[in-house]
Amino acid sequence: MKIVGGALLLFAFLPPVPAGALEKPNVLFIAVDDLANALACYGDPVAKTPHLDRLAASGVRFDRAYNQIPLCNPARASLMTGLRPDQIKVYDLDRHFREEVPDVVTLPQRFMAAGYFTARVGKIYHYDVPAGIGTEGLDDPASWELTVNPKGRDTADEALIFNAEPHRKISAALSWLAADGTDEEQTDGMIATEAIRLMREKKDEPFFLGVGFFRPHTPFVAPKKYFDLYPIESMRLPYAPGDDREDIPTAAFAHNNPVPNYSLPEPVLLEAMQAYHACVSFVDAQVGRLLDALDELGLAEKTIVVFWSDHGYHLGEHGGIWQKRTLFEEAARTPLLVRVPGATGNGRACPRVVELVDLYPTLTEAAGLGVAEGLAGASFMNLLANPGAPRESHAITQILRPADDRLAVPVMGCSIRTERWRYTEWAEGAAGVELYDHRGDPKEFVNRALHPTAEDEAAIALLRPLLRAKASGVVPTSAFDPARL
């Protein structure tokens, strides 16, 4: 028994294997970077993602999955520890969760303790991109028995990358390259190759294999054939009413994107959209290689497959928001596909609200391991059996803003999402409040908190205490780097 970040972590062993679970199944844990719900299986009208569509058709597609903080390092640290950002005190791109919770047992550690071989290929914990490619990044050595860090020709081709915002590094700017060469020469192609090699080598023992792809994080680099899938004339910027920004608090807009569309002309923005979609299709192809390998190695029927992104991504919504770091649906919502062999819910979509912190207890239950109490999330194993089953749940997402020329002091934003509502507070309301009714406003165009009806006020009264119970709107006293938020 131990106290972790204010939470009691206690491992209790289940006597039986849960219904629908396998005995010591493998886990193929696939992560992607900065992926919006820009997949055909999620209804994207232009996306070409046949392999992820195949996974969705054979598993459960979660339509309301949410991350805990839409920024790479803290989002990944939260998922892997099963704890919220306020518990691990990670809000920026540099702080390691073990500074706050040195003895926390991560998800792969839990499998390692149960006799699994645990390995990572590519980006599971945080890496700076592209500078960290080929390194260990901000990894957690205790989580893995083996790590593999491929470095492909995309790093050698950096001088060829077009940067639409030359005043910023390609890691942060809208930047892209339609690359020469094959998939296998790119870092993400090499990651797939190495993951397949490990699956072949370890096919006769249980494994937890983390496979982390770097795209579609900027710079958007993929072989040219994927760009060819998306003619510029098929690209469209998202619609927003002309007055959309008038009811949105200043703090709601990310500090790295204060100007709509970075003041870039529409033709350049359409090229950026083309490049983003090209990277999504490129990653889709690499996932297809992994799925094919499971079939070829006879592992598909004894391997749980999880596909997740660290957070969502903006592609010009709300009159020109790009990238992440907001509490709007586009950044807070995360694509999540889960396939447990034999689960009766496979092939269906789940409309219930789940969080990325729910993955830790779900996977340990699905594998028949001990249940770790004191985690922030709750298992959604029952939804894998029946995706439409009732679930009393809500999702919490937060983001920390630095002081800048718009905000006199740092501001914490916290948001709660139910199946119907999104309620957001900035500095506990002192810097703004938002309420969106997804029943009639799925794009979050109308902030009902400014002119609330009696029904809106009742919703706020219900949601506010639920939100504040799980996320503090007070700026943390723990260390954070304002330049790395």
Please state what every model-predicted region is:
Residues 72, 470-473:
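Functionally engaged cysteine thiol sites
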